[in-house]
Amino acid sequence: VNLGEVGFLNAVDPADAVETVERLLAELRAGDPLPIRGLDRLAVTGAAVDPAINEIVIQAPTRGAAAPLALTIDVDDHRYLQTRADGVMVATSTGSSAYNLSEDGPLIHPAVPAMVVTKMADRAHHPAMVLPTTAAVQIAVEGPSEAVVVSDGRTRTTVALPQTVTVARHGTSVALVEPTPHYFDALEKLA
């Protein structure tokens, strides 16, 4: 309930939360199946942050032209690109409708098993890359002195540079009861 502004984890307005939970509990007691979807999570090595349902962000402590990071991004040990940017995020399909979308990343249907690498204020304007959830994204970060690694906008840690951070699918998923079961009903919030 209300974990973001446009993302799909806030399918219920706070004013409707009690009524929605009561309806779902009544359906459960009646033996009706609940609309449950498994959510992939992202795990990080190279920085101490919690697994993420939406995205992992690696960014400069301050954003803007004065503090870009030098990023080398490999996917499964193959070079994807080198660039200078304010940061980079790796988002799940569910997270593609949140911060990723605000950074001009693609919107991915939540049933598609994918993750997306989106650069933040990329100086060379590289497009985002959609990857399978089996991929491991290695991000070598260089910059003035440090970077911040953030999981779902909630847990963060500062890392000294240079540092390599790897983002990959976590071994377990999270079950989500979806009171708005159809993806396109939730898209109305993006208009």
Segment roles from a protein language model:
Residues 2, 56, 153:
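A residue-level signal for conserved active-site and pocket-lining positions in enzyme catalytic cores
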Residues 1-2, 111:
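Short hydrophobic/aromatic-enriched beta-strand-loop microsegments
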Residues 6-79, 85:
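Catalytic core of DAGKc-family lipid kinases
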Residues 75-76, 125-191:
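ATP/nucleoside-binding phosphotransfer catalytic cores, i.e., glycine-rich phosphate-binding loops
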Residues 4-9, 108, 124-125, 174:
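Short gly/pro/ser/thr-enriched loop/turn and capping motifs at secondary-structure boundaries
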Residues 44, 73, 95, 149-150:
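Short aromatic-centered micro-motifs
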Residues 38-40, 52, 65-69, 84-86, ...:
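A generic structural signal for well-ordered coil/turn residues at beta-strand boundaries
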Residues 81-125:
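Gly/Ser/Thr-rich active-site loops/lids in small-molecule metabolic enzymes
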